[in-house]
Amino acid sequence: ASDGRNAAADDKASDPIALTVRGGCCSHPVCYTKNPNCGGRR
């Protein structure tokens, strides 16, 4: 039962984290610089 809960938690966490990296990360200069998905260097 605990394995199932962990898997479900991981699945639910993955989507918001991915969205946060795409949106929020690109708003932070340090993360923006390291993330090519944000559009590369300015």
Curated annotation (Swiss-Prot):
Other remarks in the entry: Negative results: has no effect on human alpha-1-beta-1-delta-epsilon/CHRNA1-CHRNB1-CHRNE-CHRND, rat alpha-2-beta-2/CHRNA2-CHRNB2, rat alpha-2 beta-4/CHRNA2-CHRNB4, rat alpha-3 beta-2/CHRNA3-CHRNB2, rat alpha-4 beta-2/CHRNA4-CHRNB2, rat alpha-4 beta-4/CHRNA4-CHRNB4, rat alpha-7/CHRNA7, rat alpha-9-alpha-10/CHRNA9-CHRNA10, human alpha-3-beta-4/CHRNA3-CHRNB4, human alpha-6/alpha-3-beta-2-beta-3 (CHRNA6/CHRNA3, CHRNB2 and CHRNB3), human alpha-4-beta-2/CHRNA4-CHRNB2.
Disulfide bond positions: 25-31, 26-38
Alphabetically ordered keywords of this record: Acetylcholine receptor inhibiting toxin, Amidation, Disulfide bond, Neurotoxin, Postsynaptic neurotoxin, Secreted, Toxin
Tissue occurrence: Expressed by the venom duct.
Function as written in the Swiss-Prot or TrEMBL entry: Alpha-conotoxins act on postsynaptic membranes, they bind to the nicotinic acetylcholine receptors (nAChR) and thus inhibit them. This toxin potently and selectively inhibits human and rat alpha-6-beta-4/CHRNA6-CHRNB4 nAChR (IC(50)=12 nM on rat nAChR). It exhibits rapid binding and unbinding at this receptor.
Glycine amide: residues bearing it: 39
Chief place of localization: secreted
Protein name: Alpha-conotoxin VnIB
